[in-house]
Structures are given as C-alpha cells and as structure tokens.
A protein has these predicted regions:
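Residue-level detector of flexible, active-site-proximal loop/helix-junction positions
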Residues: 78-80, 275, 300
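Conserved H-loop
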Residues: 270-278
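Structural recognition of the beta-strand scaffold that forms the well-ordered cores
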Residues: 269-270, 295
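P-loop NTPase motor domains
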Residues: 2-266, 281-282, 288, 363-366, ...
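P-loop NTPase motor core of the ASCE superfamily
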Residues: 108-114, 279-384
Length: 384
C-alpha cells in the first residue's frame, strides 16, 4: 500500500502526526502538491473547531488554488468580522498594554500612546457622567472630535449639577492636553473601522485578509499583520493561520513580522510559489519557524540553487573498470577466447566525492505531484 506524506511524517516522528504539533511550509509552483497539503490543513483546522485566518499575499483570490472546504469565507476588509472590537476599552492594564503595543507598532511613540489612553479614559468618564456606560465606539469618539463639542457636553453636565465649575475647568484642561493625540488617533481609526464591528470570528469562519491587494501600500500591509498578531495573541487556541504567498519580491516584511511575533504555540502554515526569493535573514526565520518543509518545482534557478545547498551533500563513490585484451597470436587460441583468458579486467573504486543530494537542475524540472520533504534532518523525494 502506498504511503502518503502524512504517514511518512508520522513515521519520522515515531508517532502519529497531528497538525497542532507541526507547521508546514510548501514552496514551489506545483499546484497539485500545494492543493493536497492546503486542503489537509484546512480540513484539519475545521474538524478541530479552529477559525481559519487566510493571509493572502497574492494578486488574485483564486491564485493559490486552495479551497476552503466547509468554511464560510468572509472578507475582513468589508467589515464583516471584528478583529479588535475591544480595542477602545482601556479599563485594565492588559487592555492598555495591548493598545499601546498596537499603537507602537503603527508608529506612535510612548508619550503619544499614553495621551491616547488618557483621551479614551476621559471620553469614557464623561460618557458615564452623562449616564452612558456602554463600550466606546467610533461614533461616540466622533462626538469628542473638537473643543466645541467637548465644551458643549461638559456644559450640559454643569447645567444639570453633575459637574462643578471647578471640575469643568479641570476636564477642559485635560482635554486640551490630549486633543492633539486624539486628532491623530481619529485619523488612525478610519483605517481600523472595518475591524471594530461586533461580529466575532466563529469556528466555521475563514477570515480572508487580502494583503496582496495592497502591494504598493506597505504600511497598510503592516497594519493588517499587526491586527492579526494582536488577535492571535488573545485567541491562541482557537485560530489557525494560513499564509498564501505569490513569492514575488525580496521584501515581504509583513509576513516575516507575523512569523516572528506570532506566539510559539500558535498554528501557522505557509504555501508559497517561491519562499526562497526572500533575503537570507528572512529565509533563516522561515527555516526556524517551519519544521516541515516541502519543496516542489521552482522556476527561478537562483532559488533552485538555494534549495540545492539546503538539502546538503552526500558521498558518492564512482566505479571505473578497464579491460586489457592480449592480442598476441598465442593468447588467442580457441580455449583462451572461449574461457576469456586472453583478457584482463580491472575494477577500481575511486575515493568518495561530495555531490549535492538534489541538483538544482532536478529541482527545476521535477514532475507534477513530486516534492522534496525536508523534516527532522531527513530529505527525501516524495510522490504526492
């Protein structure tokens, strides 16, 4: 009976293979192998009740030819799902730390980040004084978008006796201190608005993050990756991340950011047309993040050469032989010719020489459905 790639990996592991314990990297243009591995990843995640996050670094939704099975696919950019609906709640050190971390990743320094936290607390406190204790939303923050609006709200509290003139002046002073940061934050919220909805990701949902559509807008790609990392850190056991990569360009910083910052215990996989077009430092990160690597046919000979080196060398012993024939008349009697005693055969085993296990020419011309499985120090050619 033929052995499939999961059985082989399980054998190498000396135990049954399960997706939570491994991370897969598939690199190459072979759509058959990519589809087989991708569908197994998707099916396993669905059966275990995981929300699937698809980081799609391609120019086309169908470019990677990976089906999503029974998952309901939703586009995160359409506001169909919330990745940070509690981002505006700064009522605990943990939530404040999360917001500060996200703001720092997006270019806000520590002082400005704390002014934004102070601003959100100011809005929350004022809303509570007005009798509204619900969670903060973008709509509520818009009501505090200018000095005139804030002054009007606080005057209401003074008129109803809920706020003294002294506290009124104090709060207006506080607002003037943080209003500059508040203005910057509101601009930032315009980008965040699609991810601040009320619909939480569910186990039957595949959240599509089309980062490839923002190839010319690197900050937008980085913001999407930061939001994803922030969400995964809060929901490690409930999510699977699948990165689809077209393999174009040496600088794919947002992918490396995800791989470097995502929790070690989280589940992440990557299917790429060519992961070896990344720079040397980034390739080193890939090798560390993904213990199971599958290399299929690559069109870029430079990438083929890198895989050739990665798979290492083996000792090859080459044999040579010579035949010396005695053409003297006396050595060519019928008996000599019949018994072969008119010739001398010499076989020589040369000293071992180093050769690449898989030459780049082979990697460049591999058959469809064939790949090299690189796992636990073993590198074998495998038919899928």
């Amino acid at each position: 009976m033929a052995v499939n790639y999961l059985q082989y990996i399980g054998f190498v592991q000396q135990g049954g293979v399960t997706f939570p314990n491994v991370r897969f990297l598939v690199s190459g243009v072979d759509s058959k192998v990519r589809q087989i591995v991708g569908q197994n990843i998707v099916s396993s995640a669905y059966d275990r009740g995981k929300t699937l996050f698809v980081v799609d670094n391609t120019q086309s939704y169908n470019a990677m030819q990976t089906g999503f099975g029974r998952y309901q696919v939703v586009n995160a950019l359409n506001g169909e799902v919330s990745l940070c609906n509690d981002l505006l709640n700064v009522n605990s050190l943990k939530s404040i730390s999360r917001l500060r971390s996200l703001l720092s990743d997006l270019g806000f320094d520590g002082t400005r980040a704390m002014k934004i936290v102070t601003y959100l607390n100011f809005v929350k406190e004022t809303q509570c004084r007005l009798g509204d204790s619900t969670a903060l939303t973008i709509d509520i923050l818009e009501q505090y978008g200018s000095m005139i609006l804030v002054e009007w709200k606080l005057k209401q509290l003074v008129e109803t006796g809920s706020l003294s003139e002294e506290n009124y002046r104090y709060l207006m002073g506080r607002y003037s201190e943080v209003s500059g940061a508040a203005s910057d934050f509101e601009t930032f919220l315009v980008l965040l608005s699609p991810f601040l909805g009320n619909t939480q990701p569910t186990p039957s949902m595949a959240v599509h993050l089309p980062v490839g559509e923002f190839a010319s807008d690197k900050p937008m790609q980085e913001m999407l990756s930061k939001l994803l990392i922030s969400y995964i850190k809060q929901n490690i056991s409930n999510a699977t991340v699948l990165i689809l990569d077209d393999g174009n360009g040496e600088d794919r910083k947002f992918i490396i950011d995800i791989l470097k910052n995502i929790p070690v215990s989280s589940e992440v996989h990557m299917l790429s047309n060519d992961a070896f077009t990344l720079g040397e430092a980034d390739r080193s990160i890939l090798m560390n993040v993904f213990p199971i690597r599958i290399y299929t046919r690559h069109e870029n000979m430079t990438s083929c050469g890198r895989i050739e080196c990665l798979c290492g060398q083996i000792d090859v012993v080459k044999h040579s032989s010579t035949v010396t024939i005695d053409k003297r008349f006396r050595a060519n009697s019928a008996w000599d010719m019949l018994l072969g005693t008119n010739r001398t055969e010499t076989s020589i085993a040369n000293a071992p020489t180093k050769e690449y296990r898989f030459r780049k020419e082979i990697i460049n011309t591999m058959y469809d459905g064939t790949g090299i499985i690189d796992y636990a120090g073993n590198k074998v050619m495998f038919s899928f």
